[in-house]
From Swiss-Prot:
Annotated keywords: Iron, Metal-binding, Mitochondrion
The keyword Mitochondrion is annotated on this UniProt entry: yes
Record's protein name: Iron-sulfur assembly protein 2
Main location class: mitochondrion
Sequence positions that bind Fe cation: 89, 175, 177
Regions annotated as coiled coil: none
Gene Ontology MF terms in the entry: 2 iron, 2 sulfur cluster binding; 4 iron, 4 sulfur cluster binding; iron ion binding
Record's function text: Involved in the assembly of mitochondrial and cytoplasmic iron-sulfur proteins. Probably involved in the binding of an intermediate of Fe/S cluster assembly.
Gene behind the chain: ISA2
Family recorded in the similarity comment: Belongs to the HesB/IscA family.
UniProt KW Chloroplast keyword: no
Additional observations: Present with 1560 molecules/cell in log phase SD medium.
Pfam families: Fe-S_biosyn
Length: 185
């Protein structure tokens, strides 16, 4: 009896809209289309320099990701390392880890001219994106960059937490975890 009385006092109204009125794409937050819109609206930074740049391969970094990386670097002197490995529910997964900045920063940062030809043939060399004003670095090995070519590193704030994400490029599909993906051939 009290529940019925409470229900009538609150005067619940039925919503005037139904889910059928909205296209399904409104609810696919992890879809490629959603992230494409996100990236086109978000400004990208130009790295101060790219060490060991490989022609034809690129990783874009959003302004939001750069700001967060600068904050991390300022507080703990750590850089972001991106790597890709096989696994996950879609075939590949990327790992984002923070590693301490060292002096000299990275083994591949300064090359000895005498051995530069030998180092250029190394498939595991690191490509280093130096953020503007030397406020951190993004480090990715050449094999991972080959898979993540033309993608964008961004930083998202969501209700469930904040995280770095890699979006666009040849990423065909991803899962709910946000780190597993499949690539287009």
């Amino acid at each position: 009896m009290q529940a019925k009385l409470l229900f009538t006092r609150l005067n619940f109204r039925r919503p005037s809209t139904t889910l059928r009125q909205f296209p399904l794409t409104c609810f696919l937050f992890h879809s490629k289309a959603f992230y494409s819109d996100l990236v086109t609206k978000e400004p990208l930074i130009t790295p101060k320099r790219i060490i060991n740049k490989t022609p034809g391969l690129n990783l874009s970094i959003s302004e939001r990701a750069s700001n967060r990386l600068a904050e991390i670097y300022r507080n703990s002197k750590e850089n972001l390392r991106i790597s890709v490995e096989s696994g996950g529910c879609h075939g590949f997964q990327y790992n984002l880890t923070l590693e301490p900045a060292t002096k000299p920063d990275i083994k591949n940062d300064v090359k000895d001219k005498e051995f530069s030809d030998d180092l250029d043939d190394d498939d595991s060399k690191d490509i280093i994106y130096v953020l503007p004003e030397d406020k951190g670095r993004v480090i990715i090995d050449s094999k991972s960059l080959n898979i993540l070519n033309n993608t964008t590193l961004t930083y998202t704030n969501e209700l469930i937490g904040s995280s770095f994400k890699i979006i666009n490029g040849s990423l065909k599909s991803s899962c709910g975890c946000g780190s597993s993906f499949d690539i287009e051939n």
